[in-house]
């Protein structure tokens, strides 16, 4: 498929085009997601009303759906927006937050996957496993490490869902069901900042807005994000998660393609 170092250059394309990323995300992370996308160089919009989501989705470069704080009205808006995005050829990125934690959450994740053509599904191992009816340890909306081969799980999920799957954790995996890429960047402090995973999903959306190959977009996004986290931790990690969060937003804005190429650690499986 090519050298991942070349895919890192998508960062410049994102910053050059400033794609509009339409987020229907959860109330806990809205501000952090918007600020993170702005730091990256994308243009965020948070539109939830079912009366306007179809129109907004068609205007966007990507649509991001996140079920972190779902309710019936929001789910209806997601389905309307997703169908409109599919009609317009706009990539849809899905974050099945907490799939497996409750039956309603799991059923909603399945419903979205069945009714909308998804470009990328980004979640932790438990969420992805529950998306395809497999068991994995989960606690609330955050998963433990669980057990099993995450690469194999990701490939099964990609094949079953018909989409690119990105599983994030201590190591990140991106696959289309055939080739798989492991990204070894990141930092544990990301788990101490509410919305870090949700923002990552939206960052994948920004990269998918400028690159039709969803594997390339996801690998480039996750590598960039992980490098930014490592730089932020080196700068402010000892002061704690509050300082890290600020430093992380700064790093998202500061780092360039050369940083990603130099510090990225990507392995093909």
UniProtKB/Swiss-Prot annotation:
Keyword ATP-binding attached: yes
**One GO molecular-function annotation for this sequence?**
magnesium ion binding
Record keywords = ATP-binding, Kinase, Magnesium, Metal-binding, Nucleotide-binding, Thiamine biosynthesis, Transferase
Single GO biological process annotation from the record: thiamine diphosphate biosynthetic process
What the record says about family reads: Belongs to the Thz kinase family.
Output the superkingdom of the source species. Answer: Bacteria
**Residues reported to bind substrate:** 46, 195
For binding ATP, which residues are annotated in this chain's numbering? Answer: 122, 168
Organism listed in the record: Geobacillus thermodenitrificans (strain NG80-2)
Name the HAMAP family for this protein: Thz_kinase
Task: List, alphabetically, the CDD domains matched.
Answer: THZ_kinase
Q: Which Pfam families does the record match to this protein?
A: HK
Is Transmembrane among the key words of this record? no
Q: What name does UniProt use for this protein?
A: Hydroxyethylthiazole kinase
Q: What does this protein do?
A: Catalyzes the phosphorylation of the hydroxyl group of 4-methyl-5-beta-hydroxyethylthiazole (THZ).
Q: Which cofactor does it need?
A: Mg(2+)
- What catalytic activity is recorded? 5-(2-hydroxyethyl)-4-methylthiazole + ATP = 4-methyl-5-(2-phosphooxyethyl)-thiazole + ADP + H(+)
As recorded in UniProt, its EC number(s) are 2.7.1.50
Which residue spans adopt a coiled-coil conformation according to this UniProt entry? Answer: none
Pathway(s) per entry: Cofactor biosynthesis; thiamine diphosphate biosynthesis; 4-methyl-5-(2-phosphoethyl)-thiazole from 5-(2-hydroxyethyl)-4-methylthiazole: step 1/1
């Amino acid at each position: 498929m090519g050298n991942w170092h070349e895919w890192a250059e998508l960062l410049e394309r994102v910053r050059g085009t400033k794609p509009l990323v339409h987020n229907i995300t959860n109330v806990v992370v809205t501000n952090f997601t918007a600020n993170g996308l702005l730091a990256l160089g994308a243009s965020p919009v948070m539109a939830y009303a079912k009366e306007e989501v179809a129109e907004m989705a068609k205007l966007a470069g990507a649509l991001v759906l996140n079920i972190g704080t779902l309710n019936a009205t929001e789910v209806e808006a997601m389905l309307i927006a997703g169908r409109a995005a599919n009609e317009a050829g706009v990539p849809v990125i899905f974050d099945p937050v907490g799939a497996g934690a409750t039956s309603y959450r799991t059923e909603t994740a399945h419903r979205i996957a069945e009714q909308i053509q998804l470009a990328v599904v980004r979640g932790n191992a438990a969420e992805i496993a529950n998306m395809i009816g497999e068991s994995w340890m989960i606690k609330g909306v955050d998963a433990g490490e669980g057990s099993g081969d995450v690469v194999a799980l990701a490939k099964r999920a990609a094949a079953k869902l018909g989409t690119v799957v990105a599983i994030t954790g201590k190591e990140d995996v991106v696959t289309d069901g055939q080739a798989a890429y492991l990204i070894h960047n990141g930092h544990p402090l990301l788990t101490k900042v509410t919305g870090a995973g949700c923002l990552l999903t939206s960052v994948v959306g920004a990269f998918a807005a400028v690159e039709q190959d969803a594997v390339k977009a996801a690998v480039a996004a996750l590598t960039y994000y992980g490098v930014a986290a490592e730089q932020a931790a080196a700068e402010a990690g000892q002061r704690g998660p509050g300082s890290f969060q600020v430093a992380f937003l700064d790093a998202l804005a500061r780092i360039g393609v050369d940083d990603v190429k130099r510090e990225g650690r990507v392995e093909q499986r």
